From Swiss-Prot:
Gene (name only): id3
Disulfide bonds: none
PROSITE patterns: BHLH
Task performed by this protein: Transcriptional regulator (lacking a basic DNA binding domain) which negatively regulates the basic helix-loop-helix (bHLH) transcription factors by forming heterodimers and inhibiting their DNA binding and transcriptional activity. Influences cell fate decisions in the embryo by sequestering and blocking the activity of the bHLH transcription factors that control these decisions. Inhibits the binding of myogenic bHLH-containing complexes to E-box DNA, thereby preventing activation of muscle-specific target genes. Also inhibits the activity of neurogenic factor neurod1/neuroD.
Record flagged with keyword Phosphoprotein: no
Protein name listed in UniProt: DNA-binding protein inhibitor ID-3
Record keywords: Biological rhythms, Developmental protein, Nucleus, Repressor, Transcription, Transcription regulation
Pfam families for this protein: HLH
GO biological process assignments: axis elongation; head development; negative regulation of DNA binding; negative regulation of DNA-templated transcription; negative regulation of transcription by RNA polymerase II; neural crest formation; regulation of cell cycle; rhythmic process
Subcellular location: Nucleus
InterPro entries: bHLH_dom, DNA-bd_prot-inh, HLH_DNA-bd_sf
Length: 118
């Protein structure tokens, strides 16, 4: 699975993240701040199904038209996170190599200036 995301509008991604954030906050707050009907098992199941639907929309590589189990959706999410970690690790490694090369160049330039001046 590649870590390349299909083109999505910024507003739809922002709305999805806000929706997930609100649901996460309501779960973290506990039962005293939950809305009506959320304490019931069916309400919780409905919320979880909504979360899985959002994951299917947001994670690239999940076939949109197919019926996947929750475990399959989570496996796609885990694979996508792993792919992102690899890409970020490669970017950090390239940045450190470039910074090292840049510092070597500046040291050489400084040494060259010193020999010309003295």
């Amino acid at each position: 699975m590649k870590a390349i995301s299909p083109v999505r509008s910024m507003s739809s991604c922002y709305q999805a993240v806000c929706c997930l954030s609100e649901q996460s906050l309501s779960i973290a707050r506990g039962s005293s701040h939950k809305g009506p009907g959320v304490d019931e098992p069916m309400g919780l199941l409905y919320d979880m199904n909504g979360c899985y639907s959002k994951l299917k929309e947001l994670v690239p590589g999940i076939p949109q038209g197919s019926k996947l189990s929750q475990v399959e959706i989570l496996q796609h999410v885990i694979d996508y996170i792993f792919d992102l970690q690899i890409v970020l690790g490669e970017d950090q490694q390239q940045n450190s190599i470039l910074n090292l090369q840049k510092s070597d160049f500046s040291e050489l330039a400084t040494q060259g200036d010193a020999s010309v001046c003295h």
